[in-house]
Amino acid sequence: MAFIDWDLAAPGARIHDIAHVCWQYLGLGPSVTDVDKAARRMRLIVDSYELPDPQRLVSTILWWQDRCWRGIETQADAGDLAMARLRDAGAVRQVQSAYQWVSDHRDALERSVQ
């Protein structure tokens, strides 16, 4: 058994948790130099957590990334100082780069979890 705690922890869909684990703990983004290794690690996570619908995993990772950068932008524009600091520090660009990387390697990542 494992417990995963996020800043905004709340009950939610299991696939959302697993997608977030893959994104954050595997560092899915431009710093990954070995796509096959990242894909194997995704498979290990899927198997370890017995994810029943792994075919949706990569699209859910992309959903999280899109939601994250858009949320930072929206909240920063609305005057949230913490989100403005994140944006100013380059967090939006980092998440967008991660999104692009996952999109670029989507086929390999999806094959690994099927």
Give the role of each language-model region.
Residues 18-50, 65-74:
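Active-site activation/catalytic loop segments of kinase-like enzymes and analogous catalytic loops
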Residues 3, 42, 87:
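Sparse, context-dependent recognition of short Cys/His-centered cofactor- or disulfide-binding micro-motifs
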